[in-house]
Amino acid sequence: VWSRTPRRGATWNRFCSNDTAVVYLRDGELICRAIATPQRLKGQEPKDFISGGIKSEGKFSFQYGRAEARIFTKPHNGNFPAFWMMPQDGSAGWPKAGEIDIWEQINTENVSYHTLHSHWTYTLKHKQNPTSAVQSHNIDYSRYHTFAVEWTPTLISWYVDGEFVGSAPKSTDSDVLANGQWPYTKPFYLILNQSVGDGSWAASPDPNFVYETRFDWVRVYQTKAQNPTLTAIARNVIAPLSPSQNDEDADDAVHKASLWYDLSGRRINNFNQGHGIVVNGEGQKMLLPAH
């Protein structure tokens, strides 16, 4: 489901590296770091910093639903981690193809940023017509928090620890839509990363500090009403689930409410304690670990 984020020219990925010092697993969590380039890499690494992240591009994307992650970060001047989404089809280019920032934090701020980027909001600078960004204040970053987005055809809403923060609606003005306000009509993939600022928003990094963000888990949900559009079911998608009844023995109501599949999406009649995907009475639920 995941691959490491490659180095490119944007602020967030200008230091990206495959080195295990900046993207690795520890105690079941994904650890993403940004650090001054280690001495062992001097001579082969042209940058003064290296940073880590992962993405599901080309492996997992979805259209409409809820995505959430449990995250811990270490605020410090220059900190710039993110949990966000980009379009699987990015042929229109950025920002026309759109961007959904589920969560960002910068520097030492106790704020969570939740933002949409599009041609309308970024290039034409209509950020409040309609609203395209909301914030949550007084976040205690000394502990873990769950950050979530809910995405429908006409509304994108953000949550922190299950509490509603705010929403960004699709405009009803045809001229606004014609100018690229709502490109959120196609599948998007997930990105989890630790970056550092360049002074334009987040401050420039401190070479003596180890920037670190921990991603405990990532989950994606879709309801039946959203006509589930998960575009990948990979064998390395792992989610612990409880046992179900045998198809032949199940009560009809239970049978309809609890259908089980293997990791390739195939129906299974006998399901013992283990891992899989559940489609229940509320819709389809797919759990993705950050590893």
PLM region spans:
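C-terminal outer-membrane/trafficking sorting elements
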Residues: 236-291
